[in-house]
Amino acid sequence: MSEITLPEYQSIAAELKSASLAVTPAELHGLLVGMLSGGLAINDQTWQPILFDYTNEGMGWPSSALGLAQSVFQVTVNELTGTSMELSLLLPDEAGEEGLFALADGVSDFVNHFISGMGLAGIAIYKASDDAKEALTDLEEIAKLGIDEDDDLGEQALLLEQVIEHVKACVLTIHAEFGARPESNENKPTIH
């Protein structure tokens, strides 16, 4: 069985732009991951009206853009509820200096919208464990980061990769505490 992965960043960006939706793929993914990590249901469409309200003044999305969002949602659910402890981030992947700046902006967009998504899901952060609170504090600080064009860009690219891995760890920590899980068959009685 082949593993289903996130759609390509540029194709989603083009579709969102052609649908006149003022959201980037990184923002969309951050919002969905945040809502899921905040406890939003994983097996229904409750995320769609929230997405429409937040990104399009309550208006539904065109079917092609919604199909891509559905694909991103499903891949994200599979990653967050799976056993691999892996999380893919939908970030720009352009080469060169401009690509590095776009990647840094994408990380910031993802993190800011992740935090917004948690709020939209109604997360009660005051009830969070110290680990989850620390993860959220780290994400709030990461959202403020940027690339300094006067410093060594090669070194900053390496640091950005470390930041991305830390973002993933923070997201997984928060999701482990607040995120919805698929119903397990272990608690259901066996029918003979």
From Swiss-Prot:
Superkingdom per UniProt: Bacteria
Pfam families associated with the record: UPF0149 (PF03695)
InterPro entries given in the database record: YgfB-like, YgfB-like_sf
Any one GO cellular component localisation term in the record: cytosol
Family classification: Belongs to the UPF0149 family.
Name of the featured protein: UPF0149 protein VIBHAR_03551
